[in-house]
Curated annotation (Swiss-Prot):
Keyword Metal-binding assigned: no
Pfam families: PALP, THR4_C, Thr_synth_N
One Gene Ontology CC term in the entry: cytosol
Keyword check for Protease: no
Functional summary from the UniProt entry: Catalyzes the gamma-elimination of phosphate from L-phosphohomoserine and the beta-addition of water to produce L-threonine.
Name of this chain's protein: Threonine synthase
PANTHER family: THREONINE SYNTHASE FAMILY MEMBER, THREONINE SYNTHASE-LIKE 2
Annotated source species: Schizosaccharomyces pombe (strain 972 / ATCC 24843) (Fission yeast)
In-chain residues carrying the UniProt-annotated modification N6-(pyridoxal phosphate)lysine: 117
Length: 514
């Protein structure tokens, strides 16, 4: 199979980009996100043909549908995929765990940084290196193309990006994270990496402040042109593409168990990237009847699917001086006010429901109007018919902090299995789904996004009262032993300020290249 897919911007200002251009640019010049010119279909008979394939083999098949052979040959792509997933600790890469309550937990945390983002960022790091090596060939040092990756993290993206890019030639990586708003393990995973091309920057604010700074960097045409800015956040299409694989792989796992008559996926999500990959899988032909969004108390997605209003802050997050920051929860990777990837889905929604002739140009015009209204007013409301169409694709649930802790307890009591707080948001949502559909024969797959050791505060809060529980012996991996005591390197930037950030990047790059 070989793809002829090209890439276009959701805002309509850029089209006919190659896969390489979409990956290296990350964000289109008009501020839009890259999407494929068409969604390819899974080949006829794919279930029987792929059911016994390994995770890397399925990843190769999926990526071949989106990457033209003229850009990356079959042999080159296979080597990239195999290299990317050889770093995972489990032979199945993303294994399924069946719980006694009937839920199936898809363990996505067996990569180098113990988080689902390794699935995408191990591949993306190798992809960056592949493209740059090809571009640079034997060029002298002062003529080589150099990529400056700038990303924001609420915890897991940062460490996964760093582990995917550390030591890569012709790549520098700058990761912004909110001071005091990531877990100690997450911060240590980032700041203890000593490779000279890795730079961590703390911001006195929240994740959305970091994400806004990254967007401003991408929006600065001159700065972007000078430093060749690249993206590792889920705005980068390659991340979404990589994540499609585990939806197909897990479906085939339950298919082989004879449990695939009605399969539904539950996805804890804040930025909408993880579940968007499931949407693409469904559009490609994956026979799943439902995608279930699980949010924490920062519930912009849940509120949209309940009301049709996409609104940055709810009434509890508004002060006399205006909207305030995301609520601090036990699932910090989802403490997000604005879901960056939701723009991609809104484009497809506009194409299907609002574009008179269902053309990409019309969809981009409508999407741009929605996003401009959202930027101006902090809210945008879609028509009831549009909301009805959205509800055919997704349903959603909101899980509170207390319910998150209770879910960790429930699964420990029933299965002696320990889940992290983000997975707990998904599991609690799954328990509600099971209750609502208890008379139906449905297979639920809940995505488990991180290893519980990364969130000791929440896990210990939930389980410390159990006499048979011991964090160090039951949860803590040997890879984390002593990590908190290692020497750290970090740049403190103070309050969010784009000029200070640009100065930090320029000074650091000049030192790195000296």
């Amino acid at each position: 199979m070989s793809s002829q897919v090209s890439y276009l911007s959701t805002r309509g200002g850029s089209s006919n980009f190659s896969f390489e251009e979409a990956v290296l640019k990350g964000l289109a010049n008009d501020g839009g996100l890259f999407i494929p010119s068409e969604i390819p279909q899974l080949p006829s008979g794919w279930i029987e043909a792929w059911k016994d394939k390994s995770f890397p083999e399925i990843a190769f098949e999926v990526m071949s549908l989106y990457i033209p052979r003229s850009e990356i040959s079959a042999d080159e792509l296979k080597k990239l995929v195999d290299r990317s997933y050889s770093t995972f600790r489990h032979p199945e890469t993303t294994p399924l765990k069946s719980l006694k309550n009937g839920l199936n937990v898809l363990e996505l945390f067996h990569g180098p940084t113990f988080a689902f983002k390794d699935v995408a960022l191990q591949f993306l790091g190798n992809l960056f290196e592949f493209f740059l090596t090809r571009k640079n060939g034997n060029k002298p040092e002062d003529e080589r193309d150099h990529l400056t990756v700038v990303g924001a993290t609420s915890g897991d993206t940062g460490s996964a990006a760093i582990y995917g890019l550390r030591g890569k030639k012709d790549v520098s990586v700058f990761i912004l994270f909110p001071n005091g708003r990531v877990s100690p393990i997450q911060e240590a995973q980032m700041t203890t990496v000593t490779d000279p091309n890795v730079h961590c920057i703390t911001v006195n604010g929240v994740f959305d402040d970091c994400q806004d700074l990254v967007k401003q960097i991408f929006g600065d045409v001159e700065f972007n042109k000078k430093h060749h800015i690249g993206a590792v956040n889920s705005i980068n299409w390659a991340r979404i593409l990589s994540q499609i694989t585990y939806y197909l792989y897990s479906y085939l796992s339950v298919y082989k168990q004879g449990k695939a008559d009605d399969v539904r996926f539950i996805v804890p999500t804040g930025n909408f990237g993880d579940i968007l990959a499931g949407y693409y899988a469904k559009r490609m032909g994956l026979p799943t009847k439902q995608l279930v969004i699980a949010t924490n108390e920062n519930d912009i997605l849940n509120r949209f699917f309940k009301t049709g209003r996409y609104e940055k802050a709810d009434s509890t997050q508004v002060s006399p001086s205006g909207p305030i920051s995301a609520k601090e929860t036990y699932s910090p990777a989802m403490d997000i006010l604005v879901s960056s990837n939701f723009e991609r889905y809104l484009w497809y929604l506009a194409l299907a429901t609002e574009a008179p002739n269902h053309t990409p140009a019309e969809a981009s015009e409508i999407l741009s109007r929605w996003m401009n209204e959202f930027k101006r007013d902090g809210t945008v409301t879609v028509r009831p018919e549009v909301l009805e169409a959205a509800r055919r694709d997704f349903v959603s649930e909101r899980v509170s902090n207390d319910e998150t802790i209770d879910a960790i307890k429930k699964i420990y009591e029933s299965d002696h299995y320990i889940i992290d707080p983000h997975t707990a948001v998904g599991v609690e949502t799954g328990l509600r789904c099971l209750e609502k559909t208890k008379d139906q024969d449905i297979t639920y797959i809940c995505l488990s996004t991180a290893h519980p050791a990364k969130f000791d505060k929440a896990v210990n809060l939930a389980l410390s009262s159990y006499s048979d529980y011991n964090f160090n012996t039951q949860v803590l991996p040997i890879e984390f032993d002593g990590l908190l005591d290692e020497e750290r390197t970090c740049i403190f930037s103070g309050k969010p300020n784009i000029d200070i950030l640009k100065q930090i990047i320029e000074v650091t790059l000049s030192r790195e290249k000296a």
